[in-house]
Amino acid sequence: MKVLWVALVVALLAGCQADMEGELGSEEPLPPEQPRGQDSQPWEQVLGRLWDYLRWVQTLSDQVQEELLNTQVIQELTVLMEETMKEVKAYREELEGQLAPMAQETQARVSKELQAAQARLGSDMEDLRNRLAQYRSEVQAMLGQSTEELRARMASHLRKLRKRLLRDADDLKKRLAVYQAGASEGAERSVSAIRERLRPLVEQSQSRAATLSTQVGQPLLDRAEAWRQKLHGRLEEVGVRAQDRLDKMRQQLEEVRSKVEEQGSQIRLQAEAFQARLRSWFEPLVEDMQRQWAGLVEKVQLALHLSPTSPPSENH
């Protein structure tokens, strides 16, 4: 009985994996098996033979369900989700700190949009975890239901969730680019505005210096020239300081963008490793089930020669 449940769970997971691999563009083939049909996969052969025998099965052991359908998958997904949201929150706080010199209105808008993007990403990841938990519950109660319908529905949910997660990541990258451009443009406008405000003062000081030179003489002219040069130097100092701050802000934004891309790469690598771990869990079960199934077929065939009652024939 345990072998039959193992076969059923493996068949469902293999089917969902096949649909997801088709969406992600994976080209890794499943292990070879003697075909039941010309184009059928090994899990399809196992599932087809298994349904003939499951018509005789009326009850299942609760202990078998607890052993096979544990919460390890959902727990690992929860840890990955919490780590991801922690990194997103740290990135948002760092970016808000860098945008502190900007106008209050701009800073509030950026903070609000980043919080919304973080909330969407968290909602999508929570939805993914809930879908897997729902799928686990449906597998526990799936005896007598349509496996193909359950597998297709789960694969469709995962494809939609993957598209939503990718869309959120693209939206976050686009917003980063917009914020970087806006910060650069705002800093340049600030420098230009400071120069425009100080230009009349410089011109006025030059005019006064010329007037004083004609009225008072060379000493006052020298003093006015020194004042003009001091004011000009301060203006240049303000411009250089603003430019340095702009360059520093650009560098920090670039570091943040690199950090986000690195985190995205780590998430993808963890997802691939998680998928490989799932495959390594269930492939030995499939092989063991196939060996036990062969022995079961021999026993059934032997029983057919000894008993007038025979099981239903295969219609695949």
Curated annotation (Swiss-Prot):
Protein source organism: Ovis aries
Transmembrane portions of the chain: none
Endpoints of the signal sequence: 1-18
One Pfam short name: Apolipoprotein
Chain spans, region Lipid-binding and lipoprotein association: 209-289
Residue numbers binding heparin: 161-164, 228-235
Phosphoserine: residues carrying this PTM: 146
InterPro entries for this protein: ApoA_E, Apolipoprotein_A1/A4/E
UniProt entry keywords in alphabetical sequence: Chylomicron, Endosome, Extracellular matrix, Glycoprotein, HDL, Heparin-binding, Lipid transport, Lipid-binding, Oxidation, Phosphoprotein, Repeat, Secreted, Signal, Transport, VLDL
Main location group: secreted
Any GO MF annotation of the entry: low-density lipoprotein particle receptor binding
Sequence repeat residues: 79-100, 101-122, 123-144, 145-166, 167-188, 189-210, 211-232, 233-254
Biological-process GO terms, alphabetical: acylglycerol homeostasis; cholesterol efflux; cholesterol metabolic process; chylomicron remnant clearance; high-density lipoprotein particle assembly; intermediate-density lipoprotein particle clearance; lipoprotein biosynthetic process; melanosome organization
GO cellular component, one term: chylomicron
Segments of this protein annotated with the region 8 X 22 AA approximate tandem repeats: 79-254
Region (Specificity for association with VLDL): 277-289
Name of the protein: Apolipoprotein E
Function summary: APOE is an apolipoprotein, a protein associating with lipid particles, that mainly functions in lipoprotein-mediated lipid transport between organs via the plasma and interstitial fluids. APOE is a core component of plasma lipoproteins and is involved in their production, conversion and clearance. Apolipoproteins are amphipathic molecules that interact both with lipids of the lipoprotein particle core and the aqueous environment of the plasma.
Subunit (UniProt): Homotetramer. May interact with ABCA1; functionally associated with ABCA1 in the biogenesis of HDLs. May interact with APP/A4 amyloid-beta peptide; the interaction is extremely stable in vitro but its physiological significance is unclear. May interact with MAPT. May interact with MAP2. In the cerebrospinal fluid, interacts with secreted SORL1. Interacts with PMEL; this allows the loading of PMEL luminal fragment on ILVs to induce fibril nucleation.
PANTHER family assigned to the protein according to its UniProt record, in alphabetical order: APOLIPOPROTEIN (PTHR18976), APOLIPOPROTEIN E (PTHR18976:SF2)
